[in-house]
Amino acid sequence: MIATRTLDGRLVRLVPLAPAHAEVDARWNADAEVRHWLHRSEDGPELRTRAAVEKKIREVIADPYELRFVIETREGLPIGDVGLLGLHPHGRAELSIKIGEKSHWSGGYGTDAILCLLGFAFTELALRRVTLIADADNARGIRCYEKCGFRHEGVLRAHRLRYGKPLDMVAMAVLREEFAPPADDGGRR
């Protein structure tokens, strides 16, 4: 699904994903520390070149069940991406987020991006539920999701492999009626 407009948060702007973002995304994907927290941490080099990422971006844009944005600082620096996967006619989708610029980790940018996207998802897309799964050892990410209103729904035991070892994952979700956008957003969401 093509994102058609920019969404504004307190710290970030969500701009529609475009092939022009391929170079920066390939750089993030090539960083082992960034990749460690992604569900594809052991992927081969296929999404680490500009050409491969550009091809993938074109596929994402053409997919009617996926909506992706690049996270930019208010100054226009791309720092990651956020999106909704598996958009379903029953009003649900799965959240995906990556902060690729490590200098922006733990600065509130991911929280702001998620809150901005959730506001859009529940109001303009009329979703009922947004889910996610996170590595059980990703304490920073889980705290962020909790701040955004996600609740724990269960543990997926030995759900994926990371570096050849089974890893538990935490299933979380937020419902439309549970979501409360921040009061200090100045009406930007």
Give the label of every model feature segment.
Residues 106-120, 142-147:
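Conserved acetyl-CoA-binding loop-helix of GNAT-fold acetyltransferases
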